[in-house]
């Protein structure tokens, strides 16, 4: 490559698509710098192999960025606190990473004086949108180059291109595209394109020789796990430890079908044991400490947050507002959750919190309470029926009378009360003798 060639920073994973991009971009006249952004899920040997792959296919220089903590701080923490599961099953394992990868690639690109940035996304998935939106927002001055998308390259074509030039084809190249990261692993391709086809047995079946069932205890502070079995452990380190433990049981494996940012349907297989355990445990702890409407509105906004993140719209200012609400809602989400792990499944079997609103000293569901009397409960239940009674009256004209018990006014006289349903049917306002006395007094 001539020294005057313009510099380009390529988001590089070491997989087939980005491996193809290196020599293809070099042939097009670019001095290609590969940038591997570690978002979790890779081992030192994995990173060594990625570095060798980049050099063997012609990278001028290879850069590595450890972004695991940034992924956790910027994205994963809100996915936990928001209990975000797309389609009620999938914890957004990939969406949390792509924007951070774009952020890191732009930082490297500016550091090396690059004129362009590139990625290996196809034209049919979500990643192209996530990368392009982030790159345009972060670095509008940089050209975006996408060989796979622009040339419509398929996997078999990329393999043939590399083989013809005597360049190494990634060892795992084949029918599947695999993404491993802090928040889980996904598989795309092959069987995932046929909605009737099942996955390989190893994807959904528990390991052949899992350990016996066991329990763990997670300690929580402000809606985030901060301890594992009484020992301080948080962030990426806790997720990694929990993910390894879940994998021994085969916990967290499933299939997700959803709508892409482009409006088409997509199907993936995934394994995200740590994500599912943390979200499940966090949700149960929240039930102790949040009011019904706190949980309701937080969940509605968190669902929107997940949708926007999934579709590459992380930089929409509304997401900063939602993050502020989520953070505020977690002030009292502290305590412990007890989780039972077994082959292929987990259960949250216990929760406790110093801020629990489940207080046996004042009330026990279905048994007794000290906050109200039986007469007060009867009155509450009667008033609670009003909207449905009114709706029935409006829909049916004259709804059938419902059996009702008598109620007493404060003087204890049943003769001074009138049936609420009779008043609803006649359209009259209920008026007791006591109320009449008050009206007369005002006269």
Where are these regions (language model features)?
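Nucleotide-activated chemistry modules centered on ATP-dependent adenylation/adenylyltransferase
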Residues: 2-400
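Short, low-complexity, charge-dense intrinsically disordered segments
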Residues: 396-414, 418, 423-425, 429-443
């Amino acid at each position: 490559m001539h020294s005057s060639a313009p510099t380009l920073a390529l988001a590089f994973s070491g997989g087939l698509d980005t491996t193809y991009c290196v020599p293809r971009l070099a042939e097009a006249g670019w001095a290609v710098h590969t940038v591997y952004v570690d978002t979790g899920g890779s081992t030192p040997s994995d990173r060594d192999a990625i570095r060798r792959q980049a050099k063997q296919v012609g990278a001028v220089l290879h850069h590595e960025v450890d972004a695991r903590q940034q992924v956790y701080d910027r994205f994963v923490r809100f996915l936990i606190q928001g209990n975000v599961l797309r389609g009620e099953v999938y914890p957004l394992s990939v969406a949390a990473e792509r924007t951070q990868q774009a952020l890191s690639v732009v930082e490297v690109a500016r550091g090396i004086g690059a004129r362009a940035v590139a990625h290996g996304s196809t034209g049919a998935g979500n990643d192209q949108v996530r990368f392009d939106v982030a790159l345009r927002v972060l670095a509008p001055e940089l050209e975006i180059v996408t060989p796979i998308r622009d040339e419509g390259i398929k996997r078999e074509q990329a393999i043939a291109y590399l083989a013809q030039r005597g360049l190494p084809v990634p060892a795992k190249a084949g029918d599947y595209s695999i993404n491993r990261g802090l928040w889980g692993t996904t598989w795309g391709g092959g069987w995932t394109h046929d909605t009737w086809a099942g996955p390989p047995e190893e994807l959904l079946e528990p390991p052949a020789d899992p350990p016996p069932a066991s329990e763990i205890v997670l300690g929580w502070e402000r809606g985030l796990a901060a301890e594992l079995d009484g020992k301080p452990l948080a962030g990426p380190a806790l997720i990694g430890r929990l993910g390894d433990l879940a994998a021994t049981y085969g916990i967290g494996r499933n299939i997700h079908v959803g709508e892409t940012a482009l409006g088409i349907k997509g199907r993936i297989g995934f394994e995200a044991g740590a994500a599912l355990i943390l979200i499940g445990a966090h949700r149960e702890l929240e039930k102790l400490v949040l009011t019904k409407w706190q949980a309701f509105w937080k969940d509605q906004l968190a669902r929107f947050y997940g949708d926007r993140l999934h579709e590459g719209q992380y930089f929409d200012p509304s997401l900063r507002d939602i993050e502020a609400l989520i953070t505020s809602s977690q002030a009292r989400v502290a305590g412990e959750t007890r989780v039972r792990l077994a082959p292929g499944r987990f259960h949250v079997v216990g929760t406790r919190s110093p801020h629990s609103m489940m207080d046996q000293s004042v009330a026990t569901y279905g048994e007794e309470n000290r906050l109200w009397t039986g007469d007060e409960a009867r009155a509450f239940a009667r008033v609670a029926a009003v909207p449905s009674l009114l709706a029935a009256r409006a829909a049916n004209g004259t709804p059938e009378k419902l059996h009702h018990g008598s109620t007493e006014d404060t003087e204890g006289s049943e003769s001074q009360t009138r049936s609420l349903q009779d008043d609803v049917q006649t359209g009259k306002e209920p008026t007791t003798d006591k109320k009449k006395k008050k009206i007369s007094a005002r006269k």
